[in-house]
Curated annotation (Swiss-Prot):
HAMAP family from the UniProt entry: MEMO1
UniProt protein name: MEMO1 family protein MHO1
Predominant location: cytoplasm
Function summary: Plays a role in haploid invasive growth under conditions of nutrient insufficiency, suggesting that the function of the MEMO1 family in cell motility/invasion is conserved across species.
Compartment(s) where it occurs, according to its Swiss-Prot or TrEMBL record: Cytoplasm; Nucleus
Leftover remarks: Present with 339 molecules/cell in log phase SD medium.
Listed Pfam families: Memo (PF01875)
Inducing stimuli: Expression is induced by mild heat-stress on a non-fermentable carbon source. Expression is also induced upon entry into stationary phase and upon nitrogen deprivation. Expression is repressed by inosine and choline in an OPI1-dependent manner.
Species whose genome carries this gene: Saccharomyces cerevisiae (strain ATCC 204508 / S288c) (Baker's yeast)
A GO-annotated cellular component: cytoplasm
Gene disruption phenotype: Is synthetic lethal with PLC1.
UniProt-listed Gene3D superfamilies: LigB-like (3.40.830.10)
Length: 338
């Protein structure tokens, strides 16, 4: 048995079990969603240090429709340290350590998926992740303690649920569609849940992104006319701009959420890609989100209520007012199916 150590415990979050459990439990019970939300089978949530994003993150987990029939939870996260293309990397560990208890990896599913090939060239679509890459990445690990705390909160034994971590980097549209086809079969099974790990806008020169819009209408016009948004520079006169930078960031982030909420299911993937191209918004989990959108587009019979995105909470690490400032945005979302 190979156990992935909790490499970010003691830095990104507490390595003391009682302290960590109390912190996360407090976030969960303070979220206005007492949940679970019926048929909320996919959540989108941030992956920063818990003191920054924990309160927002908790809204996603409080909504998750956990029940005693759940057998597997997929966790999709972006890669922050390595670049790869047209493949999904899956954890090669059999167990994942957290200070609150360990989670078992669905190793049987790993063996099944690494046999899947891209029909165009026979290349494997799923590949085991090397241990160093796995241990360096925080986007997947930051979901684990919150998941364990939520399972305990819902009185579900850790022994009854397996997880399946997946790292996503750069895929072509065709590969996204191919992977979406595979994952859609698992989404159709209500005993599978999905966690998509993503922060929203990373704003500031240190992130090489200073996009600005003065209003929702201005952004809507840019999308319709396919013109890129303004990028602020040190020479930009902020007094000539309609709203403070932090409000502009929120306008762009909420437009991203609205794109996912309001676009018909079969058109979401393309609308999402267009939004990203026009705004350049630095949503670090844009690629895992794209994979999920591709998978959802394959689901033709989603029940009487269809597929719906909801966004119960949003926050920013700080309010940017100057070109010299920076911030990261956090959004909690859930997707109901049926």
């Amino acid at each position: 048995m190979s156990i992935r150590p909790a490499t970010h415990a003691g830095s990104w979050y507490s390595n003391r079990a009682q302290e960590l459990s109390q912190q996360l439990h407090t976030y969960l019970i303070k979220s206005t969603l007492k949940g679970p939300i019926h048929n909320a089978r996919i959540i989108i949530c941030p992956h920063a240090g818990y003191r920054y994003c924990g309160p927002t993150m908790a809204y996603s987990y409080a909504s998750l429709d956990l029940n005693r029939n759940v057998k597997r939870i997929f966790i999709l996260g972006p890669s922050h340290h390595i670049y790869f293309k047209n493949q999904i990397l899956v954890s090669a560990f059999s167990e994942l350590e957290t200070p609150l208890g360990n989670l078992k990896v669905d190793t049987d599913l790993c063996k099944t998926l690494i046999q899947k090939e891209y029909p165009e060239n026979g290349k494997k679509l799923f590949k085991p992740m090397d241990h160093d890459t796995d241990m360096a990445e925080h986007s997947l690990e930051m979901q684990l303690p919150m998941l364990v705390e939520t399972l305990k909160w819902r009185e579900i034994s850790l022994d009854t649920v397996k997880v399946f971590p997946m790292m996503v980097s750069h895929n072509s549209v065709d590969v996204d569609r191919c992977i979406g086809n595979i994952l859609s079969e698992y989404i159709k099974d209500p005993n599978n849940l999905f966690i998509v790990s993503s922060d929203f806008c990373h704003w500031g020169r240190r992130f090489q992104y200073t996009g600005y819009v003065g209003s929702k209408e201005e952004l809507n016009d840019a999308i319709q006319e396919e013109t890129e948004v303004e990028m602020l520079t040190a020479r930009s006169k902020l007094s000539h701009h309609q709203v403070p930078i932090w409000q502009s960031i929120e306008i762009m982030d909420r437009y991203a959420m609205k794109t996912l909420s309001d676009t018909p299911n079969g058109e979401r993937y393309d609308a999402w890609k267009q939004y990203l191209e026009i705004t350049g918004n630095t949503i670090c989990g844009e690629k895992p989100i794209s994979v999920i959108l591709s998978a959802l587009s394959k689901i033709r019979d989603a029940g009487p209520s269809g597929i719906k995105f909801q966004w119960p909470n949003y926050s920013q690490s700080s309010h940017v007012t100057s070109i010299d400032d920076s911030s990261v945005s956090y959004a909690s979302g859930y997707v109901t199916i049926g």
